[in-house]
Structure formats: C-alpha cells, structure tokens
A protein has these predicted regions:
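Alpha-helical transmembrane segments
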Residues: 1-3, 31-46, 104-111, 229-234
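Hydrophobic cores of alpha-helical transmembrane segments in multi-pass inner/ER membrane proteins
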Residues: 2-13, 74-87, 146-151, 191-207
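Membrane-helix interface linkers and caps
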Residues: 2-33, 52-64
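Cytoplasmic membrane-interface regions of multi-pass membrane proteins
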Residues: 8-28, 85-95, 205-218
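Aromatic-anchored segments of alpha-helical transmembrane domains
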Residues: 40-49, 107-119, 166-178, 235
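Function-critical hydrophobic alpha-helical transmembrane segments in multi-pass membrane proteins
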Residues: 62-121, 135-149
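Functionally important transmembrane alpha-helices
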Residues: 138-206
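Internal/C-terminal transmembrane anchor helices
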Residues: 219-235
C-alpha cells in the first residue's frame, strides 16, 4: 500500500523515482543497480569470511513452505515500500542541491529510527551503560552507515539501486538457513566498513573520461565529504 501511494504521488509530480542514472560512466557494474548488487554481495562475503573464523548458527526464521512464502511477501513488500519512499524523499529534497547533504542526513535518520523497535529506544536512555553501548555499536551505527549508503544509491539511481543493496542483505538475512554467529563488535565493524568501502568505490567509479585520457569526477554536489567523515568516525 505504501509503495503504491508513493509511486502514484511521484507519477503525479512527474518524478521518476524507480530507476535512473545520474552518472554518465560507471566502472563498477554497468549501472547503479549492478553496483549496488556487487557491494551487497561484498558485504555478505565479509560476513561469511568472518563466520568461518567465529562460527555459524541456524537461522531463527521459519523454512517451512508457508513460512518462506509469508516471509517473501513480508520482506518484498516492506523493502519496496521503504525504498520507494526513500527515493521519493531524496528526489523531492534534492531539487535544491544546496540542501542535498541535509536532506540525505534527515532521510537517513528517519529510516534508522523507523528500523528500530519501540522497546529498543530504552537503550538510548543509557540506564545501563554496557547494553546501551552494545546496542549503539551493534545496531545503531551499522544502520546509520547502511542507510546513508542506501540514500546515496537512491540519489544516484533511484529506488531500484537502493533495493539492489538492501534487498541483497535482506535476502541473505531472511532466507539463508545458516548465518554467521558473530560477536557484536565484529558485526558492527562489517556493517559499517562494507558500506563505507562501497561508497568510496562508487565515488571513484563515477568519473568522466575525456579524449585526452584525463579523468574528471562527475560534477554534482553530493554528501561525499560529510558521508566519509561520518563513516570514518563510525568505524
């Protein structure tokens, strides 16, 4: 329902929020969607490699036919609704490029807060220091990094690109029968480092090549410096 409403609103306003390409040349994949899939796969690879050293555990989700079907419907509908909404907010807010960094920051925080259950907000009160620190390191910081990256992908390529990244991670989380059983510190590091590296890789890939073999970065005011600073501090 959310996806339908957002898509209709975008159509009425003449905004393409599903699939576009702001960069003229890509060196990682052929378009933002393929780049997002590759970065998502890279993050999963890091988790699997870490799992080899720290162990694996069984998935907590149901793998009965009914359970799988229910989860597919739930994950797919939620993912499409969230990413279409993300792309719509980014597209609407990025009409004025002077406010682009602020818009991406606001949208990121909004979706991070949306991802946290009401009971988890009690950790942010710091009544018990260690669980609060663990929650921030294990959940908040990776969510911040991944949502920042998803917003950046939505800015470059629309909802389809963001779905390519977030959908890859969701598919692994929900439909893999075994999952890496990682210490919260390792999980936090991977969840923050992978999107940060993905951001750097994409920043270096969207360049224009001139006839004189001189490369010029794609000229657009994006939150590169702010994003990199936040990601570095998070790591």
């Amino acid at each position: 329902l959310l996806a339908t409403i957002v898509y209709i609103l975008a159509k009425q306003e003449g905004k393409n929020i599903w699939n576009f390409n702001k960069a003229r040349h890509w060196e990682i994949g052929r378009n933002p969607f393929e780049a997002a899939l590759l970065i998502g796969g890279f993050q999963i690879s890091l988790m699997i490699i870490a799992g080899i050293f720290f162990g694996f555990g069984e998935s907590p989700y149901s793998f009965t036919p009914i359970g799988i079907t229910t989860n597919i419907v739930f994950v797919t509908s939620t993912l499409i609704g969230i990413e279409l909404s993300r792309a719509y907010f980014i597209k609407k807010g990025s009409l004025n490029r002077k406010n682009l960094t602020l818009i991406i920051g606001i949208v990121t925080i909004f979706f991070v807060m949306l991802s946290i259950t009401p009971s988890d907000y009690t950790y942010l009160l710091f009544k018990d220091l260690l669980p609060s620190i663990k929650f921030i390191g294990e959940t908040m910081i990776p969510l911040l990094a991944m949502n920042l990256f998803a917003c950046y992908l939505a800015y470059l390529g629309g909802a389809k690109a963001a779905i390519g990244y977030m959908g890859t991670l969701q598919a692994f989380q929900w439909f893999s029968p075994i999952l890496p059983d990682l210490d919260w510190g390792i999980a936090a590091l991977i969840g923050t480092l992978a999107p940060a590296l993905g951001f750097i890789i994409i920043q270096n890939s969207i360049q224009l090549t001139t006839p004189g073999n001189r490369k010029k970065r794609y000229k657009t005011k994006d939150p590169a410096l702010s994003w990199t600073a936040i990601a570095t501090i998070s790591v």
